[in-house]
Amino acid sequence: MKYDHILVRFGEISTKGKNRKKFIEKLRQHIRFVLKDFVALKYASDRDRITIMLNGEDPEPISEQLKGVFGIQSFSLAVKCETNLDAIKEAALTAVQEVYEQGNTFKVSTKRSYKQFELDSNEMNREIGGHVLRNTENLTVNVKQPDVHLRIEIREQATYITFKDVKGAGGLPVGSSGRAMLMLSGGFDSPVAGYQAMKRGIQIEAVHFFSPPYTSERAKQKVIDLTECLAAYGGEIKLHIVPFTKIQELIHKQVPENYTMTSTRRMMLKIADKIREKRDALAIITGESLGQVASQTLESMYAINHVTNTPIIRPLIAVDKNDIIDEARRIGTYETSIQPFEDCCTIFTPPSPKTKPKLEKVERYESFADFEPMLDEAVEQIETIIVKNEKKAADEFADLF
């Protein structure tokens, strides 16, 4: 079947009222970015969809790319024809004859957006259905479960013929809900949290804490690889790598062992907040799941959160670990997360961390040392990497040989 258009339908954008144009433009920009390698494509948008003109490009790889774009409810490969009865009948017959097999059943569904068209939807179904039946051998009607579902959308400027809707990623276009900092470790949780935040329209920048020589370059590369996985869904992502060794060493020197985990998380959150302020972001995202580990009890989160008034977004707070792992598999981060390279969250883990730390105690322990200059120094020494999804380009290069 030689399709010449793709019809892209919005998800929740349709409910956004006065901000609708902004959301549609964000989605259009992201679609253009994702499909930038397909140079012949042209785009048009209106109130309820974006139309992609293929101009000879292969629709299959384009469809695969569109499936991961947040803000798309569904899309359809389409054939365009003129909005007159004879042209529609001819295009519908040609389309059915290209896709059907001997003995198939079919059904016609018409959506008539152009109300001045000469026939209504039911009349069109009968007219087109009869024309197709008369001119196609061994084809019968089945309105409940057809093998071929011919869909006709009549608009004033053009009519589009499609056969199926492809489910999109849903959610909101990346960037339409503002920017936030993702505290990214090498585990399962934080990449999934980042994915969920992007699905709600947040443009993420990742913050990773790196503690050489206790953590290796391979652990750092693991986080870069995880960021690359996420970039497949949100375009390029800035990854801020924070030197954290001196701060961790001071924590373990000054803070009682069972409070070191709490203090470490507080310092991380302080640094993430300083970066957030520099980057004009509005929130911090974490992969915390209630009760999963000692630092994720309500008491721990209360003591840790006390260092900032910035909103903390926790997409996974009520999600079970097994469900998080299943989601990691689905979005493609699982195989990277299982690599056995320790990050700074695991190398200094005490044998019996406090599950119900007291805020006044951790504040008193931290007062024994002046952490603030070290936090500022860490922020100044950040290494920032712009991460793109290079896997697609590498796969395309490999296909040449």
UniProtKB/Swiss-Prot annotation:
EC numbers, comma separated: 2.8.1.4
Binding site for ATP: 183-184, 208-209, 265, 287, 296
Reaction it catalyzes: [ThiI sulfur-carrier protein]-S-sulfanyl-L-cysteine + a uridine in tRNA + 2 reduced [2Fe-2S]-[ferredoxin] + ATP + H(+) = [ThiI sulfur-carrier protein]-L-cysteine + a 4-thiouridine in tRNA + 2 oxidized [2Fe-2S]-[ferredoxin] + AMP + diphosphate; [ThiS sulfur-carrier protein]-C-terminal Gly-Gly-AMP + S-sulfanyl-L-cysteinyl-[cysteine desulfurase] + AH2 = [ThiS sulfur-carrier protein]-C-terminal-Gly-aminoethanethioate + L-cysteinyl-[cysteine desulfurase] + A + AMP + 2 H(+)
Residue ranges of the TM segments: none
Compartments, as annotated in UniProt: Cytoplasm
Superkingdom of source: Bacteria
SUPFAM superfamilies assigned: Adenine nucleotide alpha hydrolases-like, THUMP domain-like
Biological process terms in GO annotation: thiamine biosynthetic process; thiamine diphosphate biosynthetic process; thiazole biosynthetic process; tRNA 4-thiouridine biosynthesis
Coiled coil: none
One GO cellular component, as annotated: cytosol
Domain annotation THUMP: ranges: 60-165
Pathway annotation from the record: Cofactor biosynthesis; thiamine diphosphate biosynthesis
EC top class, as a word: transferase
Keyword hit for Zinc: no
GO molecular function per UniProt: ATP binding; CCA tRNA nucleotidyltransferase activity; tRNA binding; tRNA-uracil-4 sulfurtransferase activity
Pfam entry (one): ThiI
Keywords: ATP-binding, Cytoplasm, Nucleotide-binding, RNA-binding, Thiamine biosynthesis, Transferase, tRNA-binding
Protein family (similarity comment): Belongs to the ThiI family.
PANTHER family, sorted: TRNA SULFURTRANSFERASE (PTHR43209:SF1)
NCBIfam families reported in the protein's UniProt record: tRNA uracil 4-sulfurtransferase ThiI
Task of the protein: Catalyzes the ATP-dependent transfer of a sulfur to tRNA to produce 4-thiouridine in position 8 of tRNAs, which functions as a near-UV photosensor. Also catalyzes the transfer of sulfur to the sulfur carrier protein ThiS, forming ThiS-thiocarboxylate. This is a step in the synthesis of thiazole, in the thiamine biosynthesis pathway. The sulfur is donated as persulfide by IscS.
Name of the protein in its database record: Probable tRNA sulfurtransferase
